[in-house]
Amino acid sequence: MGQIPRFLSWRNMLVLSLAINFSLILKILKGDRERGDSWDRTAYVSIWPVVSTTASESSSLSSASCNYSKIEEDDDRIINLKFGDPTVYERYWQENGEVTTMVIPGWQSLSYFSDENNLCWFLEPELAKEIVRVHKVVGNAVTQDRFIVVGTGSTQLYQAALYALSPHDDSGPINVVSATPYYSTYPLITDCLKSGLYRWGGDAKTYKEDGPYIELVTSPNNPDGFLRESVVNSTEGILIHDLAYYWPQYTPITSPADHDVMLFTASKSTGHAGIRIGWALVKDRETARKMIEYIELNTIGVSKDSQLRVAKVLKVVSDSCGNVTGKSFFDHSYDAMYERWKLLKQAAKDTKRFSVPDFVSQRCNFFGRVFEPQPAFAWFKCEEGIVDCEKFLREEKKILTKSGKYFGDELSNVRISMLDRDTNFNIFLHRITSSFNSTL
């Protein structure tokens, strides 16, 4: 075995090794940055080189309608439209960021309690006030004589509702059903804890069992965007209405929703998914009490700081609707969704290789005009013999989507997010219009 020269000690060798490795790392990073790869990855896309832009780099949608076909892109990039990350709202909030800025002093939010006189004792009074106000302004939900339950996103509220509505006796787990295509996370959340209170019961369209059941009604529906009502229609059914997308940028507001349990979330109403705040409007006091009990057991309440931020954001949204000199938040959001759906429908018409749903126009009481739904997701169907649309788009187009199988539907369907940043969405349009014909 060779001897290390005396003038090189083990300490010298260690320093030399570290220097060599560090230089290699710098070279790799430099190469990544020169290729334009984003360094700040989120966990769910860490295995793919995803196109990412900062909000300041996003182009306006008005110019996108003219320029997406001229985009210069790296064909090796992966476009991830699998998740509903609402970064389409970044531009609006950057331009209006000052009015939502708030300072939270260090002594604030020390106590667990927000309002000991409220049934939901961890609900911040300011948030409760702004929730009632925004629903009154938009006209999308009845809030009078309702209990407001705040949660860490609507996902926690869904679990709380299952806990509250399930029988707590020896009758066994109650079935939970939803009509296909249903929200892909419902089965996973329902069965993740193997609860003795409830279990996933499958497609509401084919459900025939006797006895009590819980039916989830998502309207507008995720993934296909259609307005929905209950399907089973048995007298023993208990309904949960997920209304996360019942806002005027996505669908006409035809009347205030009036149901026993209604779930909403900041992530899809204002785009603030990272704050993780949702709320339920609950008609029955005992149901609300049990939902609150679940959240007590699960997380001992909900972040006060997040609640205060959402309260501030909702106030700005409501204030903007009364601003006669400028566009409201919902005007901006509607325009963005309208432009994207116009481009996608035109692409489908031009290529004839894929299709998206046709919607019925209705009059929106909020905007005072008639328009078609323009959902947060596109239920995208590959035509002409493509059996597995998700696989085709992933392997041939380098576009990540969510397969229809996760929604209880066919492999020829995929769900595509319409909420990503402009650059990603424009490259997506460019690929499906410029190279669809050459691949098929």
From Swiss-Prot:
Enzyme Commission no: 2.6.1.27, 2.6.1.99
Summary of activators and inhibitors of this protein: Inhibited by L-kynurenine.
CDD domains, per the entry: AAT_like (cd00609)
Residue ranges of the TM segments: 7-26
MF (Gene Ontology): carbon-sulfur lyase activity; L-tryptophan:2-oxoglutarate aminotransferase activity; L-tryptophan:pyruvate aminotransferase activity
Cofactor(s) annotated in UniProt: pyridoxal 5'-phosphate
Residues found modified as N6-(pyridoxal phosphate)lysine: K268
Protein topology in the membrane: Single-pass membrane protein
Positions bound to pyridoxal 5'-phosphate: Y112, S154, T155, N222, D242, L243, A244, Y245, T265, A266, S267, K268, R276
Catalysis: reaction(s): L-tryptophan + 2-oxoglutarate = indole-3-pyruvate + L-glutamate; L-tryptophan + pyruvate = indole-3-pyruvate + L-alanine
Cell membrane is among the record's keywords: no
Cellular component terms (Gene Ontology): endoplasmic reticulum membrane
UniProt note: phenotype after gene disruption: No visible phenotype.
Predominant location category: membrane
A GO biological-process term: cotyledon vascular tissue pattern formation
Disulfide linkage: none
Family: Belongs to the alliinase family.
Cited function: Involved in auxin production. Both TAA1 and TAR2 are required for maintaining proper auxin levels in roots, while TAA1, TAR1 and TAR2 are required for proper embryo patterning. Involved in the maintenance of the root stem cell niches.
Name listed for the protein in its UniProt record: Tryptophan aminotransferase-related protein 2
